[in-house]
Regions:
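Gly/His-enriched, cation/cofactor- and phosphate-binding structural elements
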Residues: 2, 183-313
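Short acidic, S/G/P-rich loop/turn micro-motifs used as interaction or catalytic elements
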Residues: 36, 57-61, 217-219
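Divalent metal-coordination and catalytic microenvironments
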Residues: 10, 20, 55, 84, ...
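A short helix->loop->beta-strand "cap" motif at the edges of active sites that frequently abuts
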Residues: 75-80
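Glycine-rich, Lys/Arg-enriched anion-binding loops that position phosphate/diphosphate groups
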Residues: 129, 136-223
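Anionic-ligand anchoring segments at beta-strand to alpha-helix junctions in alpha/beta enzyme folds, i.e.
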Residues: 2-46
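Short alpha-helices
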Residues: 92-160
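Short, structured active-site "lid" loops
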Residues: 45-69, 73-74
Length: 313
């Protein structure tokens, strides 16, 4: 059986993939992606494969394309197993189940917890606890902060795959390899936080304070950046803009509704969506006119906030 993994790029996604690897001992292909690109990754899966999707929810704008590729894999003798903990519409669950997808959606834990629970992977409690600590923002296991920095230290698939294989053998110990990487990561991270605090801007929308920041592609730790900005500026919503996508964080408001209206999804307090800038905006970005791009990005969010009645001027 050709086994293919498609998972998210953060600690929870990498840990989920590590548990799949631990269960079967071998994966033929490993893909890391964001929810808005899931259909693209699925399109590259060979016919007849056993596909394992972890820590990725559905973006409604690409749902039809996702179904097309799922049908192709299943009709060619393959299988699709999907493990997630984000908020799903009942119609999505029903449609995928009817196609023949083995779907496990459980919001009571993180994605690694879902994989652990439904695949019955032995001796993996330590990794699950660490992943959930960070992903669910519980902060009840210090190792989660170490592992998230290890996973996010370098961008790109090769480092993520190295980290995934490392975590497949995680026994709860933070060894010297991980701690050395974390030490370097913290130095980089502090510079990123300092930059974000200096460059972030504020907008008001009917009493809702929105802090926004345009994040460089190499800057990871979106939730950490958002959390710092929410605290520093006493904001209701943090908008983290990137080239091609957007992340929303809040402690009090349901940002999933905003993300959903933009074709995305996620959790009530942490959500995201893809951004499709026109040629002018793309040129602004590549020419270094980042402030204009950031304004365009936050304006799209404010427009959706108004339409979902989260605020009104």
């Amino acid at each position: 059986v050709r086994r293919v993994l498609i998972t998210h790029t953060d600690l929870d996604g990498v840990a989920s993939g590590a548990l799949i690897l631990k269960k079967f001992g071998h994966l033929d292909r490993i893909y890391f992606t964001q929810p808005h690109n899931l259909h693209v990754r699925l399109a590259g899966v060979p016919n007849g494969s056993a596909v394992y999707i972890t820590d990725i929810g559905v973006n409604k704008t690409s749902f039809d394309k996702i179904k097309e590729n799922v049908k192709r894999v299943l009709s060619s003798g393959g299988e699709v197993f999907w493990f997630d903990h984000h908020v799903w519409e009942e119609s999505w669950i029903k449609e995928l189940a009817e196609l023949g997808v083995s779907l496990y959606v459980d919001r009571s834990t993180c994605s690694a917890g879902v994989v652990y629970k439904y695949l019955g992977i032995e001796a993996s409690e330590e990794l699950v606890r660490a992943a959930c600590s960070v992903d669910l923002w519980l902060m009840n296991d210090w190792r989660g902060n170490f592992l998230s920095r290890y996973v996010g230290y370098v961008g790109g698939a090769s480092w993520k795959e190295k980290a995934l294989k490392k975590l497949a053998g995680f026994d709860g110990t933070i060894d010297s390899e991980i701690s050395d990487v974390v030490e370097k990561a913290i130095t980089k991270e502090l510079k990123i936080y300092d930059k974000a605090l200096k460059k972030a801007k504020i907008r008001e929308c009917g009493g809702v304070k929105v802090v926004y920041y345009l994040k460089d592609q190499e800057e990871h730790l979106t939730s950490y950046i958002a959390n710092i900005l929410l605290s520093r500026y006493e904001a209701d919503i943090a908008v983290i803009c990137r080239r091609g996508s957007i992340s929303l964080r809040s402690r009090t408001l349901n940002v999933r509704e905003v993300a959903l209206s933009m074709g995305g999804g996620g959790h009530p307090r942490a959500a995201g969506a893809s951004l499709k800038p026109d040629l002018v905006r793309r040129l602004m970005y590549f020419l270094g006119l980042r402030s204009f791009y950031a304004e365009w990005c936050v304006n799209k969010v404010l427009k959706q906030l108004e339409s979902t009645q989260a605020c009104s001027d």
